[in-house]
């Protein structure tokens, strides 16, 4: 079977981990394949994980071994379609075509990747272009015309890229060497060479680039050799700019210390270790890129607005190349470009990150504003398809329930936003179709879709029948989920369904095993009955509550009943020592004593309490301030590293501080 054919349904295993009644998509990698069918096994993997660059590279290497040139170009084409701004992929492709000595293919690729809408900007890609120009224009045989062509190419690369790239030493070295190797045949040519060299040195020595000291020494020596009488004048004119550039480079170097920018430029260099992988990016690297971009925006070089934007755009392009699977990098880039470019950048971003919610939602907003409803629907469907496939793979391969739950909620969230968006742009009927499709996933979605749909139905029609039916249907899958029951109760309280509130409470309390969730449900119903029922029912509910939770503080439950707009004012106003410094209730034991102390309440020798006046807070030590400065921002952590509530509970219950002597 050729690489372009799609296997029919008969080639899929009849029994697989993915086929157990789930409505999630079937996994292509579970198709029956000959173990030796490397080509189609790789294509199945690509279909299942279409942004895994390594798989494409392995397939290309397979075709290289088979000398299947057309297939190699086809796979490279797929890569460029998915990752049009990944300059290193264009460089790998160009270097392979150069090895085949295919000038026509090389020129076509160069025109495609260095101009127009897909214009890349990377020093290694431009260096490949320069190498090709020099190969085609031999200055020994081509003379002045060939030299002129090469000089134009160097000037182009300098203006487009090298002046923005701090790590561009090789370019400047090659350019200077090319000019130094020029052997003038007349005084006019010699004068031209000197002027071009001086102009180049002036440009270089005003830029924050690496090895600047070396170039400065080389420049001063060159000026002395050209003309000792004028050397001091030219060197003096450039000295201040050089000192500033050197200082700025050192500042940039310190700021970006630890930044990794190593990507392969040839096919045989590409490995799993040096290729970007979907779902994997280093938050620390992301933080450094963000700092670099901000440093450029601060305009330390005092550039005109137009040049500044070009420079910042260059850094953004570098960032999205090295962090192409980090949605934040793409979002920031999309918000930086001109308004008419937002949609185009986001389109490219979601090709690299088809399952990114933030990028999908932002692109959907622009599509909605431009009335591109069909494209909007396709975007949501592509995002949901990608997340669904990732969830199916997780179901088959991981034993971590937290990862599966996270992915399930991600899929549900995508459906929720898709549903509400369709309600906004086309109406209730389209939104109901989305909900109908989503609920077929049964346990592969989380409860939020039922809650979201219920509120949508209610606010659209002010009718409680349909939303209550929706929430009742959700009980089929989430009757033991305390969070769902809590949300269900919130809705019933909103729409004043007293009988259903009591019925739901009585039917669920024996099915919920999470005691924290069950406690919240009890408190919610007690609070409701306290405000809208009668006191006898409140006392009966409290009796049942304390039978279930005998360790609970009675004053805690009592004050909870008198909450006003969700705030426990009774505790805050009359029992502030029962709350910690952040306003979080503290229940019992040593935690209460600590809270009394933090609230400024101490006990005298007779046991009576008195409030201390808090004097000025002690100054924070400088060591702590310095530590806080270098800590990464909280948004760079995908999960909660330390739960403060659990830590507080642990310290309260398990740690005993010995009394002072």
Curated annotation (Swiss-Prot):
List the keywords (alphabetical).
Answer: Cytoplasm, mRNA processing, Nucleus, Repeat
Q: What domain of life?
A: Eukaryota
Residue numbers spanned by region Disordered: 1-37
Where does this protein have compositionally biased stretches of type Low complexity? 14-23
| A single MF term (Gene Ontology) | mRNA binding
Protein localization: Nucleus; Cytoplasm
List the Pfam families.
Suf
- Entry's Gene Ontology cellular component terms: cytosol; mitochondrion; mRNA cleavage stimulating factor complex; nucleus
Repeat region (HAT), residues: 67-99, 101-135, 149-181, 192-225, 262-298, 307-339, 513-548
**Any keyword Lipid biosynthesis?**
no
Q: Which GO terms describe its biological process?
A: mRNA 3'-end processing; response to DNA damage checkpoint signaling; RNA 3'-end processing
Chain's role: Component of the cleavage factor IA (CFIA) complex, which is involved in the endonucleolytic cleavage during polyadenylation-dependent pre-mRNA 3'-end formation.
Q: What is this protein called?
A: mRNA 3'-end-processing protein RNA14
What is the primary gene name for this protein?
A: RNA14
